[in-house]
Amino acid sequence: NLVDIPIPANDDAIKSIKLIVSKLSTGIQQGQSY
């Protein structure tokens, strides 16, 4: 199983991809600060 948590999104829309990557990177940065 390659996916732990599916994220429904329109992967053809650049704005959608930018939003998801932004949220993921923010979460990673916050997690690393602890």
From Swiss-Prot:
Q: Which source organism?
A: Ochrosphaera neapolitana
Q: Could you state one GO biological process linked to this protein?
A: translation
- One Pfam family from the UniProt entry? Ribosomal_S2
Q: Name one GO cellular component term.
A: chloroplast
Primary location class: plastid
Entry annotated with the keyword Ribosomal protein: yes
Q: Where is the protein found, in the record's own terms?
A: Plastid, Chloroplast
Q: Does the keyword Ribosomal protein apply?
A: yes
Q: What is this protein called?
A: Small ribosomal subunit protein uS2c
- Please name the taxonomic classification of the source: Eukaryota, Haptista, Haptophyta, Prymnesiophyceae, Coccolithales
Query: What GO molecular function terms would the record report?
Result: structural constituent of ribosome
Which superkingdom heads the taxonomic lineage of this protein's source? Eukaryota
Family listed:
Belongs to the universal ribosomal protein uS2 family.
